[in-house]
């Protein structure tokens, strides 16, 4: 099996691979349940998500954010990104690995890279959330030292009780 590498996407092709993975992530979330599909459509309607994807490199640009891309050989198999919520606080977003690479450590490697870069950038804590059906992701975050916490941003009533929130002190 080719080596798994975590890179910082820099070329247009690498950034396009991140965008494609984010679209796959959106589709994956929508496939979890009818309720999840409603939430994704509510919070990330297609036009809004397309605009977000067009600005992804800028909205996660250093020194206030960054993107990581998981590569298996020459194939893009996962991504994750960070942006600053406030001085000292980073938020991890859109951690996703493809179906074919789940279980080989790609998610773990992505998270390790994201956490290490947050430390290097002197963030004091990392915040993140995930949907309750994503049990494997929850196990991963807890195994890495994140702890459960309450919401760190206002939660729309439609999403109350459907998300779990995590925090790691660095």
PLM segments and residue spans:
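C-terminal "cap" of GNAT-fold acetyltransferases
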Residues: 2-5, 10, 124-127, 131-170
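Acetyl-CoA-dependent GNAT
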Residues: 9-93, 98-99, 111-113, 117, ...
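Loop/helix-junction capping segments adjacent to catalytic residues or to phosphate/diphosphate-binding pockets
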Residues: 12-15, 104, 135
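Short coil/turn segments at alpha/beta junctions that flank glycine-rich nucleotide-binding fingerprints
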Residues: 88, 104, 120-124
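Active-site acidic-Proline motif in GNAT/NAT acetyltransferases
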Residues: 98-100, 104, 132
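Conserved amphipathic alpha-helical interaction elements at protein-protein interfaces in regulatory
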Residues: 103, 116-120, 147
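Residues forming the Rossmann-fold NAD(P)(H) cofactor-binding site
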Residues: 104, 108, 112
């Amino acid at each position: 099996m080719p080596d798994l590498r975590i890179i910082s996407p820099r070329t247009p092709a690498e950034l396009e691979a991140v965008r494609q993975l984010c679209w796959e992530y959106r589709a994956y979330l929508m496939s979890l349940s009818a309720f999840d599909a409603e939430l994704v459509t509510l919070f990330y309607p297609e036009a809004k998500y397309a605009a977000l994807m067009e600005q992804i490199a800028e909205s996660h640009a250093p020194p206030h954010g960054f993107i990581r891309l998981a590569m298996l050989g020459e194939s893009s198999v996962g991504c994750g990104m960070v942006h600053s919520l406030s001085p000292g606080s980073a938020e991890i977003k859109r951690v996703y690995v493809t179906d074919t690479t789940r279980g080989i450590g790609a998610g773990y490697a992505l998270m390790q890279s994201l956490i290490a870069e947050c430390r290097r950038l002197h963030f004091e804590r990392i915040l993140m959330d995930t949907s309750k059906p994503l049990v494997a992701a929850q196990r991963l975050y807890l195994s890495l030292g994140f702890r459960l916490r309450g919401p760190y941003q206002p939660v729309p009533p439609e999403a109350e009780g459907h998300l779990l929130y995590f925090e790691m002190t660095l």
